[in-house]
């Protein structure tokens, strides 16, 4: 049975919610799934004053965890069109795994959130995907089998490069039903690919 890691960073809970949906999709495909988050780098008093969501249940990952999975699906909110520094800092520690080829052939994917439709969703996804390709991973996006990314009936996230959500400038918008469906679909397709490649 394929083992899938949903690895995320979420300051305000939007990506945490998306991570849970990604995991649901991967489980529906028959994979064993763990959800873990990367360490917070912001000092506790600053995070509290900034109203970060500090009660997230997912355990904190270690870099060596990555080698234990057949698929790794990475999610983080955007920071100026790229992944958050917390996720970048974590992935930057994977040099030892990269040098050993420990991640070659694993399946990977990315998901993100932005405040606005044009807040850098695709560039953020590319910033994650670039890392996965350097690690030697097989990248799977959100293919057009998920018709929800084609809708014009609502403001919605989603791209062939990965599932996304739009939070609104003040963060009050939560992931929509369509965005969560896209996250589940991507999780399922990545898990199905991992099962085909790794059993």
Curated annotation (Swiss-Prot):
<dbReference type="InterPro" id="IPR029039">
    <property type="entry name" value="Flavoprotein-like_sf"/>
</dbReference>
<keyword id="KW-0547">Nucleotide-binding</keyword>
<feature type="binding site">
    <location>
        <begin position="10"/>
        <end position="15"/>
    </location>
    <ligand>
        <name>FMN</name>
    </ligand>
</feature>
<dbReference type="GO" id="GO:0010181">
    <property type="term" value="F:FMN binding"/>
</dbReference>
<dbReference type="InterPro" id="IPR008254">
    <property type="entry name" value="Flavodoxin/NO_synth"/>
</dbReference>
<dbReference type="InterPro" id="IPR005025">
    <property type="entry name" value="FMN_Rdtase-like_dom"/>
</dbReference>
<dbReference type="InterPro" id="IPR010089">
    <property type="entry name" value="Flavoprotein_WrbA-like"/>
</dbReference>
<dbReference type="GO" id="GO:0051287">
    <property type="term" value="F:NAD binding"/>
</dbReference>
<keyword id="KW-0560">Oxidoreductase</keyword>
<keyword id="KW-0520">NAD</keyword>
<keyword id="KW-0521">NADP</keyword>
<keyword id="KW-0288">FMN</keyword>
<dbReference type="GO" id="GO:0016020">
    <property type="term" value="C:membrane"/>
</dbReference>
<keyword id="KW-0285">Flavoprotein</keyword>
<protein>
    <recommendedName>
        <fullName>NAD(P)H dehydrogenase (quinone)</fullName>
        <ecNumber>1.6.5.2</ecNumber>
    </recommendedName>
</protein>
<feature type="domain" description="Flavodoxin-like">
    <location>
        <begin position="4"/>
        <end position="190"/>
    </location>
</feature>
<dbReference type="Pfam" id="PF03358">
    <property type="entry name" value="FMN_red"/>
</dbReference>
<feature type="binding site">
    <location>
        <position position="12"/>
    </location>
    <ligand>
        <name>NAD(+)</name>
    </ligand>
</feature>
<feature type="binding site">
    <location>
        <position position="134"/>
    </location>
    <ligand>
        <name>FMN</name>
    </ligand>
</feature>
<feature type="binding site">
    <location>
        <position position="98"/>
    </location>
    <ligand>
        <name>substrate</name>
    </ligand>
</feature>
<dbReference type="GO" id="GO:0050660">
    <property type="term" value="F:flavin adenine dinucleotide binding"/>
</dbReference>
<dbReference type="GO" id="GO:0050136">
    <property type="term" value="F:NADH:ubiquinone reductase (non-electrogenic) activity"/>
</dbReference>
<dbReference type="GO" id="GO:0050661">
    <property type="term" value="F:NADP binding"/>
</dbReference>
<feature type="binding site">
    <location>
        <begin position="78"/>
        <end position="80"/>
    </location>
    <ligand>
        <name>FMN</name>
    </ligand>
</feature>
<dbReference type="GO" id="GO:0008753">
    <property type="term" value="F:NADPH dehydrogenase (quinone) activity"/>
</dbReference>
<comment type="similarity">
    <text>Belongs to the WrbA family.</text>
</comment>
<dbReference type="InterPro" id="IPR037513">
    <property type="entry name" value="NQO"/>
</dbReference>
<feature type="binding site">
    <location>
        <begin position="113"/>
        <end position="119"/>
    </location>
    <ligand>
        <name>FMN</name>
    </ligand>
</feature>
